[in-house]
């Protein structure tokens, strides 16, 4: 850049700082790059699939999926992990369906959790904005976008048409709160539902409610699906769950994680650690037996997971080894939550157990 351009730029920057304050414009090279702070989801595989060890603070996150797929369970798990770090969390329950007893079983400190059950969509989003601007809240969950009913729709007749009203409400609210979320370094999670588009011949007919604004403003979008049942004998005790990162502005997208959600207990973290430790060579598996550092820890996955539950220091050390390896830049974690690599061993385990 020649001297005249440098002088013109310096004058422009000086005028901008005088008018808008110091830091209104800055060179990116003048400051060291800082890692994006993240809050764990409670699932090791999902934390790794997200690329930064969890959901990013100061950003908007959308979690969507079919009914009973684990959306609320996942967000309550995030709240539980945040509270363990001393964070203050809020739950905007637009669906009026939050079960404190279930939240407590997942590890949420319900006594410290702030809960709001607003009457209208405008009220819910206004409360969310005020909580963000307080700079005192670390995590806010809005459950759900589909339940953010505009005031005009509530006050109108049942058959009245309100085309695009909810989409306009979401668009206006997100324009207003996005900057505040960044300044407050607050994680805001919107839970969303799936609807079907009529007349779609090619591509997926699925779409989410509330218009397109949230798709653009969200830094991370997670598609959560129930893929099967977890059984003990004939009794169904949980769900096999797959989460796909369909959008990620802070790491490479389209990774996915698979884990189990046990009814009344939440994400089966110890079982996930066993699977990932075998997949990446930290735990050896011979037939039905699992060994860690030369010592047998259990016969079968369930017994090995119980060993980790009874020995939290070993569990934490194993989890740290997995995180250190897979969260290193340049490591491919596309199949981090998949179990294809140990399917053959699982067959051998089933044969040994039977």
From Swiss-Prot:
ATP binds at residues 65-72. This is Protein RecA. It comes from Pseudomonas syringae pv. tomato (strain ATCC BAA-871 / DC3000). Can catalyze the hydrolysis of ATP in the presence of single-stranded DNA, the ATP-dependent uptake of single-stranded DNA by duplex DNA, and the ATP-dependent hybridization of homologous single-stranded DNAs. It interacts with LexA causing its activation and leading to its autocatalytic cleavage. Pfam families: RecA, RecA_C. It comes from the Bacteria. Belongs to the RecA family. GO terms for molecular function: ATP binding; ATP hydrolysis activity; ATP-dependent DNA damage sensor activity; damaged DNA binding; single-stranded DNA binding. Keywords: ATP-binding, Cytoplasm, DNA damage, DNA recombination, DNA repair, DNA-binding, Nucleotide-binding, SOS response. The keyword DNA-binding applies. GO terms for cellular component: cytosol. Coiled coil: none annotated. One of its GO terms (biological process) is SOS response. It is found in: Cytoplasm.
